[in-house]
């Protein structure tokens, strides 16, 4: 009878299953972490170490998390866990942005616009707060499911009364430092939001508008001066403007020309016209009209000229402006100070009054016949008809261009002057200080510096006021007659903030001026709320200062690349305005998630990859591995097929660990008592290779090159382990005596390599790393969790065989294997053992 030798072999045995079953296993591990209070244990373990602070940019508390949220939170978690392994105390306090219009709209949708809940401001605020909190709970569950470890029970929320109070205090500091000003500067206005928008809330899309060329007739009294400028007697003449916003013509107050440009007097079927010399051919082609040149003059010589509004009985002043170019149009710029920044600035310079054709909601005032009550964006064709009837219209045609849209409603905006509160970029040197500060910040990728610098250089004053209910109040006390802020306002900020801390943001509505100031009859309370970008932008003051002290600057801000114009910028501006310094030492950005065709994910395209579905079907570790293995600095392609490929990559890593753990089933404290100098040389080699891998990964982690980290670890599992070492030691592991030196040497090496590898994968494959850690007593003896494991000291192993010698040995091995394969293919041998 043939003997069964199976029982004489040291066959692998492990509790680590081949099939991961992550969707079921991961929730069990989450429960385990919760039961041991893992986050707090990590804090206690690292309390005396140097801190590394990654400050969480707050997601908006509305709707389910999407793949972009997952990318952001997973990257942050990888950073935090990596820094913890490197010996830092790296706390993570997540946060949420909770005020603003989207929440208001959802509450209105739930209760109805005409409901008592919506009409009663106090009830409305309570409903908004309740809604935001419910959204936070939903998002929090999904973030935790991703394996993101943080102080979830003490997260910061911009709706917390303490946060709202600190937001008011931060505004107080900014006002005290001289950065606030009131004005009627033109700002982007959204009809759907019924409010002004900040630059960060504006998107640009292609739009077809009506472009018009309009003649502004020179008043008779100015013809003599005009004739002198052109050295030609002129009895009648018009300056021609070009604009893509016909609806702004009723608000025209001036026409701007370039002082350094040349202008030509031409004759045409429309009469004598003046336009920039460089644009005559362009205008002639656009109008289908031959223009006969009569005379030329320099812009600076054309002065003290007054024009007639094309159809309204008022003057339009001709002014010189350096903003005028000859890129397109006529070189004569229609100037409506209520509807353009350049227009506003040039009219302010020449003391020209701003004309308000629109009311505070963007509708034409009653005195504008034919337009009264109309929204500006629907007035273009009517204005064109009026201009045509008046004989001032020269040309009208469609014009394709990039136009500002509301980022929430995807509807076109108007640029309109409304009374607002601004943080001035020039007053008290805020812009200059910000541009200087970004030079000292580490930007990753490096192009981030040029991007934010160019955005700062071109940005207008920051409009921080909103006409909403659900937001932190701007608690200013304003003189009824002069509009000036109360002289004691700087002191009042703290008193008002204390009330908000106790009662919530409703405290400002409840506040009676009698209780705040003596001269209360002369003052009123401001009713505006703060831009939500101010809320999130002041978190360094409201959160970090409280948690870690006023001198701390965050080591890292990590968000999507769109935040150069959003959170990075608002945080920078408030940081400079409050403390005179940037709130971060380094800024790291990631790209957007797209499909295989480079398109953003959207339900309408059917290309959405749901993080919840990935967790339920494949497991969060697969999602985490995809994030880590993708170069996140660029656009990140996510499809079901790519995730399947990532799952295959995961299986190779897992099976490598499973083989190692299977052969360590009887490895214990006694087995570990082996002198490293006595190890078999190949065992020394694999430990040395793992130590080298550890060093390489550490350097890659320092530069956040996680895709290279994954590549290195995967290649090590496939090549050094799977392709060389594990294959070589199989016979030694299976057939030598269980307590033999040869087997103990291999087991010692396997344990050392596994101990190194498990730490390297733990920031990425958090659930799998914990599962492996819990599968062996020697790991569990080190710590309750892989995330509590002490820093491993890696000592170089002395070997009689050099790295170069090993290269020769492995080259010979490969050559022999190739010849064996050839012999097998040629049927010379049946197998390698022959």
Locations of regions flagged by a protein language model:
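Residue patterns forming the tRNA-binding/recognition surfaces of aminoacyl-tRNA synthetases
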Residues: 2-15, 19-22, 28, 32-36, ...
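Amphipathic alpha-helical
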Residues: 30, 175-207, 282-297, 302, ...
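N-terminal catalytic cores of NTP/NDP-binding nucleotidyl/phosphoryl-transfer enzymes
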Residues: 44-106, 167, 241-249, 318-346, ...
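Secondary-structure capping and boundary motifs in well-ordered enzyme cores
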Residues: 46, 50-56, 67-71, 75, ...
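Short, solvent-exposed turn/loop segments enriched in Gly/Ser/Thr/Pro and often Arg
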Residues: 46-47, 57-58, 91-104, 155-162, ...
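Secondary-structure transition/capping motifs at alpha-helix termini
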Residues: 81-89, 110-121, 141, 145-150, ...
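Acidic, turn-prone loop/beta-hairpin segments
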Residues: 97, 187, 191, 197-205, ...
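Alpha-helical recognition segments enriched in aromatics with Gly/Pro capping
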Residues: 218, 350-362, 468-470, 478-480, ...
């Amino acid at each position: 009878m043939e003997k069964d030798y199976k029982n004489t072999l040291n066959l692998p045995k492990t509790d680590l299953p081949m099939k991961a079953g992550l969707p079921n296993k991961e929730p069990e591990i989450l429960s385990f972490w919760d039961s041991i209070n893992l986050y707090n244990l990590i804090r206690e373990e690292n309390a005396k170490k140097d801190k590394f602070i990654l400050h969480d940019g707050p997601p908006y508390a509305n709707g389910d998390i999407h793949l972009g949220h997952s990318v952001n939170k997973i990257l942050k978690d990888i950073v935090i866990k990596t820094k913890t392994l490197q010996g830092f105390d790296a706390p993570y306090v997540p946060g949420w942005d909770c005020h603003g219009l989207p929440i208001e709209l959802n509450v209105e949708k739930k209760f109805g616009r005409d409901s008592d809940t919506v009409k009663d401001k106090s009830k409305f605020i309570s409903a908004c707060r309740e809604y935001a909190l419910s959204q936070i709970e939903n998002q929090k569950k999904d973030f935790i499911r991703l394996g993101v470890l943080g102080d979830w029970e003490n997260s910061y929320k911009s709706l917390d009364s303490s946060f709202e109070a600190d937001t008011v205090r931060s505004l107080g500091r900014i006002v005290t430092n001289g950065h606030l000003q009131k004005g009627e500067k033109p700002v982007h206005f959204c009809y759907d939001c019924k409010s002004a928008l900040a630059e960060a809330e504006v998107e640009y899309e292609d739009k077809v508008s009506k472009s018009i060329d309009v003649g502004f007739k020179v008043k008779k009294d100015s013809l003599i001066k005009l004739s002198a400028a052109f050295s030609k007697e002129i009895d009648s003449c018009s300056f021609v403007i070009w604009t893509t916003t016909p609806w702004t013509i009723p608000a025209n107050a001036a026409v701007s020309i370039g002082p350094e440009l040349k202008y030509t007097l031409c004759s045409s079927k429309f009469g004598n016209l003046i336009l920039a010399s460089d644009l005559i051919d362009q205008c002639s082609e656009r109008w289908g009209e031959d223009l006969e040149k009569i005379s030329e003059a320099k812009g600076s010589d054309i002065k003290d000229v007054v024009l007639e509004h094309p159809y309204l009985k008022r003057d339009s002043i001709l002014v010189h402006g350096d903003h005028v170019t000859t890129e397109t149009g006529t070189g004569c710029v229609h100037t409506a100070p209520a509807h353009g920044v350049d227009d506003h600035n040039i009219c302010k310079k020449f003391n020209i009054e701003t004309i308000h054709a629109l009311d505070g909601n963007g509708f034409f005032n009653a005195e504008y016949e034919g337009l009264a009550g109309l929204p500006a964006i629907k007035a273009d064709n009517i204005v064109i008809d009026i201009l045509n009837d008046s004989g001032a219209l020269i040309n009208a045609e469609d014009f394709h261009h990039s136009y500002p849209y509301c980022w929430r409603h995807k509807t076109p905006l108007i640029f309109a002057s409304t009374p607002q509160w601004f943080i001035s970029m020039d007053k008290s040197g805020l812009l200059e200080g910000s541009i200087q500060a970004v030079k000292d910040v580490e930007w990753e990728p490096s192009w981030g510096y040029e991007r934010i610098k160019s955005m700062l250089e071109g940005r207008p004053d920051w409009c921080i006021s909103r006409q909403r209910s659900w937001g932190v109040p701007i608690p200013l006390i304003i003189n009824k007659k002069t509009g000036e802020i109360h002289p004691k306002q700087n002191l009042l900020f703290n008193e008002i903030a204390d009330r908000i801390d106790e009662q919530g943001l409703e405290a400002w509505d409840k506040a009676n001026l009698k209780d705040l100031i003596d001269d209360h009859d002369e003052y009123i309370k401001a009713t505006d709320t703060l831009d939500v970008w101010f809320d999130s932008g002041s978190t360094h003051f409201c959160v970090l200062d409280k948690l870690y002290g006023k001198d701390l600057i965050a080591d890292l801000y990590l968000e999507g690349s769109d935040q150069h114009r959003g959170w990075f910028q608002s945080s920078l501006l408030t940081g400079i305005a409050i403390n005179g310094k940037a709130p971060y030492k380094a800024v790291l950005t990631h790209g957007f998630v797209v499909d295989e065709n480079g398109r953003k994910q959207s339900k309408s395209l059917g290309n959405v990859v749901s993080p919840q579905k990935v967790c339920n079907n494949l497991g969060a570790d697969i999602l985490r591995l995809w994030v880590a293995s993708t170069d996140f600095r660029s656009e990140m392609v996510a499809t079901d097929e790519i995730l399947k490929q990532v799952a295959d990559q995961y299986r190779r890593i897992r099976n490598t660990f499973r083989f190692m753990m299977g052969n360590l089933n009887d490895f214990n404290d006694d087995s570990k008592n082996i002198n490293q100098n006595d190890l078999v040389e190949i065992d020394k080699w694999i430990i040395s290779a793992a130590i080298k891998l550890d060093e390489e990964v550490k350097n890659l982690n320092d530069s956040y090159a996680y895709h290279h980290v994954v590549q290195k670890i995967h290649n090590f599992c496939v090549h050094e382990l799977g392709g060389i070492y594990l294959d070589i030691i199989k016979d030694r592991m299976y057939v030598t005596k269980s307590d033999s030196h040869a087997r103990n040497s291999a087991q010692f090496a396997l344990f050392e390599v596994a101990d190194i590898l498990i730490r390297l994968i733990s920031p990425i494959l958090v659930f799998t790393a914990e599962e492996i850690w819990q599968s062996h007593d020697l790991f569990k003896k080190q710590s309750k969790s892989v995330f509590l494991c002490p820093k491993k000291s890696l000592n170089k192993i002395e070997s009689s065989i050099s790295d170069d010698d090993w290269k020769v040995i492995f080259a010979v091995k490969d050559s022999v294997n190739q010849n064996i394969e050839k012999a097998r293919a040629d049927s010379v041998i049946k197998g390698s053992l022959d």
